[in-house]
Amino acid sequence: MMLITNVKAHRVRIPFNAGVASFKQGASAITELDIVIVEVSTDAGVTGWGDAFGYVCPRSTATAVDEMIAPQARGLGVPDAEGIPAFMDRIQRNLHLFGRYGITMFAISGLDIALWDLAARVKGVPLHRLIGASKRMRIPAYASLLRIGTPELVAGECETALRRGYTAIKLHETTAPTVFAARQAIGAGIPLMVDMNCPMDGTEATAFAHACRATAPMFLEEPVWPPEDFATLAEVPRRAVLILPREKMLVRFINSAK
């Protein structure tokens, strides 16, 4: 059996310009994007690559990969596609003391992705074919804008996205005027989504949804704080529009079901 000989994190830093948006960590402007690439080496010379979330915490994620994940995986057999879930479950169980979300899961996810890449390389097929048969040859992409805050600038960025060929827009705005500005800029036929990043309580989220109803958003994503308030997340859609809680709640499939 092919064995894992090492798991190593590589930090990649890319200069970044947010343009008209205010892309900050606290009061500090973010001018670089940090990516943590996870390399899984084997005794057969085949290497798998993954991506561990390192947004503003690349050192922490990389350290978790090198000092928590690598010792757990080193020396184990390389799983095939069917064996990856059980392999990753073992890793999660061994490291559950360090948290079921946050840095630990960021590092674990990088290993998970790398194992899928490795499994495809061993089979000699593209990863998409290993996962399953293709249902379509083209996938539509939407423009996911940063939080901008000013209606006029939001409208301008939406128009720029359309000129670049995007056929749907996702905002990260939390005020009704900015959402209306986007809808006016893109017209009635373009899908519009709003990702809010958990700023409101249930009453505020419901009021915001009603205020934006005329813009016909496909969904409001992460409107409620705290993101694990499942009861409120279930209540707001009954009084407003569709809510998509998404990534801040997900640990495998448990919270998705909730």
Residue ranges and their predicted role:
Residues F98, K123-R147, A181-R183, G187-G189:
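N-terminal small/glycine-rich loop or linker at the start of catalytic domains
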